[in-house]
């Protein structure tokens, strides 16, 4: 594919959600359990594969290739034990789910966080603050990735440059347009992307203050 990166927009946290009644409190305890890992080849699927492989449990869980609202519905109905979901915090759908069934957010242990960050340049240490979700009273250790703005081959280098320059020129104004963009700054726009930066975007990044 000829997709290139424009800029980093906001962090998304890789969340491991299980039914509280399963008693699962660590990634290792997911062994043998039915865990929804996202649709095959989706972003969530790759996050699940990367994190759980380094945790040593990817091959040991009963992988269910469903994601999003389907996974939440199956968890609510007791058909699966847990699921992985990558999103900004808090996620409204998970808030609604937690009102219907007791859930646990499974932490990514600190040693594993370092292992993940050292293995993949696009992961960063993260925490899920208390009370993001109903019943979640403790801080939860996690990892995050960045949602990025990408460009296809139909966008010219010049247009790519103008778009990127606009982002750098008005991050605060754009941040007011949507809650997910509220923490966007010139520094956050520069965070490393997992794909190559486009030529026009690179020029704008180089010129930005």
Question: What are the functions of these language-model segments?
Answer:
Residues 16, 30, 48, 75, ...:
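Residue-level signal for nonpolar/aromatic packing positions in well-ordered secondary structure
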Residues 22, 57-150, 154-155:
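Pocket-lining segment of extracytoplasmic ligand-binding domains
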Residues 1-31, 36-39:
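Short, glycine-/small- and polar/acidic-enriched structural segments
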Residues 26-35, 55-58, 77-79:
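Short, surface-exposed connector motifs at secondary-structure boundaries
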Residues 1-3, 11-13, 32, 100-103, ...:
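Extracytoplasmic
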Residues 53-57, 76-80, 99, 165-172, ...:
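Sec-exported extracytoplasmic/periplasmic mature domains
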Residues 139-209:
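Segments of small-molecule ligand-sensing domains
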Residues 42-48:
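Secondary-structure junction motif
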